[in-house]
Structure formats: C-alpha cells, structure tokens
C-alpha cells in the first residue's frame, strides 16, 4: 500500500495510461480528503470539475434501493474504501484508480472483459446479501439511478436488469417504450 506520512498515494488511469497522481489524507474528523499532486498528461476526463467531484460521481447514489446496505457491507461507504474495493470502475468509460505502488493493470480490472460478481448483482437487485467476502469488482457500485438494478454478463453481451417502483413497476417498461419511439 502506498501510504506515506498518513497519506495514501493513488493514480488515476485511462486504461493503462497514467493521468493523475493524487493522494488521500484523513482530516481531524477521520474523513478522507483527496488532493491532486501532478497531472501526467494534458488530457482531462470530459466534464472534469476537480478530483473530489470526479470521484464522487463514479459512486452509485446512496438513495438507490439496496445500494447503501451493499456499500456498507463491502466497505465502500467511505470514499477511500470505495476506491480500494471498486477502483472507481464504471461501464461508462475506461477511467479507474489504483494505489500508486499497485501492479494492477487495466486487463485485470476492466468491467468490459472480466466476470461480474453474481452475489453482488443479486444483492443489488433484490437486497439479499448472502456472503460477506468480496472477491471481485462489480459495476453495481458505480451505476447511477434510483431503482434497484444489476448487470449481468451473458454470452451475447452485458445487460442491465432493472426493477421499478414497489407499486406499479412500470418504469423499466416506460424506458423500453421510449427507446423504441426514439428509433
């Protein structure tokens, strides 16, 4: 672990291209604070408004059904825990984070090519957590939206399964119909 003098050093990467060296330090209230150290390229993620905002937007909203319990269960409810467990991975882009001295590569962590945790997928969808040992990353921790949902990798591709409200459960159908109309 790249920890020096009470701070942990990290690298923001785009696939295997290092983009930003940054660190996290705990303040007097034991809250993590993130600081940019050095940009390693002239490129920036689209819409970049600073490191704390960038990292925060990669995390699933706490109000999403079942997600807060999952975040707490796997140590992702704290921003630094979220980085250590999920590497801030997303299915929306190819940015990710690792500790500065970690040998991890994009090939080892990519959500596009590596299997998803079925346990986490099911817990994100139905709220039932059957195990406490997290062995792989999962797109559930970084998926936006209010209703319960999960990602499944099948032979023909990656699919998002969604539920709707408790009363009518028509939101996924409405989204499907809207997509059909837009074509």
Question: What are the language-model segments listed below?
Answer:
Residues 112-183:
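Conserved ATP-binding subdomain of kinase catalytic cores across diverse folds
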Residues 1-13, 172-179, 183:
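Conserved, well-structured beta-alpha core segment at the onset of a catalytic domain
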Residues 2-130:
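P-loop NTPase switch module centered on the Walker A-proximal segment
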